[in-house]
């Protein structure tokens, strides 16, 4: 999603997510597991079926190096498309900032769990988003919608952190 392109320290959330996915793929393949990769935005973009054979890791890493598809993200359609392709139960790992409506997250994760899959979520956030470390009034851009707001961080900080932490806790609860 567009929000994954944010990064306050020269490294975006998307970069971190790709590095995490590559690390998990290497680790899992070394222990003999088959690994696949699915990327999506509004719809499924790329799906590489799970395998563990020579050359497969290179294919996964090549896909992870590609820039993210511009546009928003929706869980509804891509998760259904993915579920239709999965013929065996397995471990599904989502790597995202999880800046999506909690109801959608609950519904999709619950649905995959009901199908017998184990689902793991990795939430990738930037330190500036977590601590709201901004100190000057500025224009903030919603990376998903493109809407812009002028915000005084001193006035917004407490409310933002409270809402952010509530959302993060609700996302964590979706995994239980």
Segments (PLM) and residue ranges:
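An amphipathic, basic-hydrophobic helix/alpha-beta surface used to engage anionic
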Residues: 1-51, 91-96, 101-111, 130
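A short, mixed-charge helix-start or loop-turn motif at secondary-structure junctions
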Residues: 3-7, 64, 153, 157
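Short, surface-exposed alpha-helical recognition segments that flank or form part
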Residues: 12, 70-73, 159-162
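Short, electropositive alpha-helical surface patch
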Residues: 47-62, 176
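Alpha-helix initiation and N-capping motif
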Residues: 54-57, 72, 157, 168
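Von Willebrand factor
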Residues: 56-90, 102-103, 125-126
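Von Willebrand factor type A / integrin I
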Residues: 84-90, 102-176
